[in-house]
UniProtKB/Swiss-Prot annotation:
Crosslink site: Glycyl lysine isopeptide (Lys-Gly) (interchain with G-Cter in SUMO2): 110, 141
Name of the protein described by the UniProt record: Zinc finger protein 30 homolog
Entry's Gene Ontology cellular component terms: nucleus
UniProt similarity note: Belongs to the krueppel C2H2-type zinc-finger protein family.
Upper lineage: Eukaryota, Metazoa, Chordata, Craniata, Vertebrata
Renumbered zinc finger spans (C2H2-type): 158-180, 186-208, 214-236, 242-264, 298-320, 326-348, 354-376, 382-404, 410-432, 438-460, 466-488, 494-516
Superkingdom field: Eukaryota
Modification Asymmetric dimethylarginine occurs at: 75
Organism expressing this protein natively: Macaca fascicularis
InterPro entries, A to Z: KRAB, KRAB_dom_sf, Znf_C2H2_sf, Znf_C2H2_type
Compartments (UniProt record): Nucleus
Gene of this entry: ZFP30
Pfam families linked: KRAB, zf-C2H2
This protein's UniProt keywords: DNA-binding, Isopeptide bond, Metal-binding, Methylation, Nucleus, Repeat, Transcription, Transcription regulation, Ubl conjugation, Zinc, Zinc-finger
Length: 519
């Protein structure tokens, strides 16, 4: 059976600069994915090397595709009789051609610019009309041909058999299914890292080529995509434009809001086929499945602890070997992980790129800002199932739970003292070593713990960030505020076993107990 030749331009979509600037990052990524995937398919079908179109070269380099628009003087004749399968999109000086199957993608990308309502059984040729305002181009109808109704009524006919998620374009379903299969056909020749989509590989390769990288001026973090940098910068300015209508909580990224809303709806679309347990996020399902499959875990031969990835095991193994390859040039302190060194160096530089919008307090880590903001919001997301007490930090919950079980698995080899948390053991061991790595720049006093230095520095600054909501009195330390609040609440948690007298502070109880010891 004879076959018609397929040219790359038959499965391509072209944009002018004006059109390209009207697309958001999601629409641009969709365009890149479709074009790169189509080119990949043509190469595989050809079975031999073919010349690479300029637009593919630009997309692989992360550049804008409109840079290869056809010659302005070149015009093609619209001939529906001889080219019935092809639609043509005219602009004043440029003419672009696309295949019928790709028209549906174009329809989706440009749907925000439609004027009026067409028949649901028609797909229209439209002419782009340039606008002086720079907004999304408008369109006027030239002619029409029958097409599926789904292009207009926004149906999603392509459904994933694994999780039920539906898509308007078959190509999107193909990309999505690779999440379930784990297929990552696009591999970086420089570092071996693999990706599900060709566009993701192209963006990654900019790291190696140093082509058009975007650096955050606040913290120095590097991004290969401008949109990723813009999203990241919201961490520093505290911007959270996506708000949940149910509880008012804000998010930096729309995807985070979508995941959060499942808490209110109770939706758990990802189900484990082994045990039937369902999850709100696919990442949670993946983690659950890997925990259930022993052969996929990475186990430490020294202590038997298992990890979900080999990287985690390698970092953990340094605990046993004592290896700390990343050393601070200022104080000589060494770290197992480079990221720990980067964060540590901010102690010396004084860099605190994360600002609280409520009180202006700055932090060296984004996570510390997140925890701090819970003081203002009152959020305590971690609940103890034993006593229903809530905590702002997960570490506080874990530490608290040790009270119920009485377990203290981390023992100091120097003195035999045991602790519930490994971090507590690490802090304690600095007593034996005499190590005090945290120095106050004002008075040169040194401290074992960063928290001690932070508390001390408030003496110099006069800062009292902890306010009593009852009387407005402010305190340097949160513990001082807790003690003060007992005046208003009348709480006296420290009771003398001899005479049953109760006290607000433990020091008061200790002082009182001397009476009984004397007698």
């Amino acid at each position: 059976m004879a076959r018609d030749l397929v040219m790359f331009r038959d499965v391509a979509i072209d944009f002018s600069q004006e059109e390209w600037e009207c697309l958001n990052s999601y629409q641009r990524n969709l365009y890149r994915d479709v074009i790169l995937e189509n080119y990949s398919n043509l190469v595989s079908l050809a079975g031999c090397s073919i010349s690479k179109p300029d637009v593919i070269t630009l997309l692989e380099q992360g550049k804008e595709p409109w840079m290869v628009m056809r010659d302005e003087k070149r015009r093609w004749t619209l001939d529906l009789e001889s080219r019935y399968d092809t639609k043509k999109l005219f602009q004043e000086k440029d003419i672009y051609e696309m295949n019928l199957s790709q028209w549906k993608v174009m329809e989706r990308i440009k749907s925000c610019g439609l004027e009026g309502q067409e028949s649901p059984h028609e797909v229209c040729f439209r002419q782009v009309t340039k606008t002086t305002s720079g907004k999304t181009p408008t369109y006027r109808k030239l002619t029409s041909l029958p097409l599926y109704q789904k292009s207009h009524n926004r149906e999603k006919p392509y459904e994933c058999g694994e999780c039920g998620k539906a898509f308007r374009v078959r190509q999107q379903l193909t990309f999505h299914q690779r999440i379930h299969t784990g297929e990552k056909p696009y591999e970086c020749k420089e570092c071996g890292k693999a990706f599900r989509q060709c566009a993701h590989l192209s963006r990654h390769q900019r790291i190696h080529t140093s082509d058009k990288l975007y650096e955050c001026k606040k913290c120095g973090k590097i991004f290969t995509c401008g949109s990723d940098l813009r999203v990241h910068q919201r961490i520093h300015i505290g911007e959270k434009p996506y708000e949940c209508k149910e509880c008012g909580k804000g998010f930096r990224v729309r995807g985070q809001l979508n995941l959060h809303q499942r808490i209110h709806t109770g939706e758990k679309p990802y189900e484990c086929k082994e045990c039937g347990k369902a999850f709100r996020q696919y990442a949670h399902l993946t983690r659950h499945q890997r925990l259930n499959i022993a052969e996929k875990c990475y186990e430490c031969k020294e202590c038997g602890q298992a990890f979900l990835c080999s990287t985690g095991l390698r970092i953990h193994h340094k605990l046993h070997t004592g290896e700390k390859p990343y050393e601070c040039k200022e104080c000589g302190k060494a770290f197992r992980v480079r990221q720990q060194l980067t964060l540590h160096q901010r102690i010396h530089t004084g860099e605190k790129p994360y600002d609280c919008k409520e009180c202006g307090k700055t932090f060296s880590r984004g996570y510390h800002l997140t925890l701090h903001q819970r003081i203002h919001t009152g959020e305590k997301p971690y609940e103890c199932k034993e006593c229903q007490k809530f905590f702002r930090r997960y570490s506080e919950l874990i530490s608290h739970q040790g009270i119920h079980i009485g377990e203290k698995p981390y023992e100091c080899k120097e003195c035999g003292k045991a602790f519930r948390l490994f971090s507590q053991l690490t802090q304690h061991q600095s007593i034996h070593f005499g190590e005090k790595p945290y120095k106050c720049k004002e008075c040169e006093k040194t401290f074992r713990l960063l928290s001690q230095l932070t508390q001390h520095q408030s003496i110099h600054t006069g800062e009292k960030p902890h306010d009593c909501k009852e009387c407005g009195k402010a305190f340097r330390l949160h513990s001082s505020l807790i003690q003060h609040q007992r005046i208003h609440s009348g709480e006296k948690p420290y009771k003398c076993k001899e005479c049953k007298k109760a006290f607000r502070q433990h020091s008061h109880l200790t002082y009182h107990q001397r009476i009984h010891n004397v007698t």
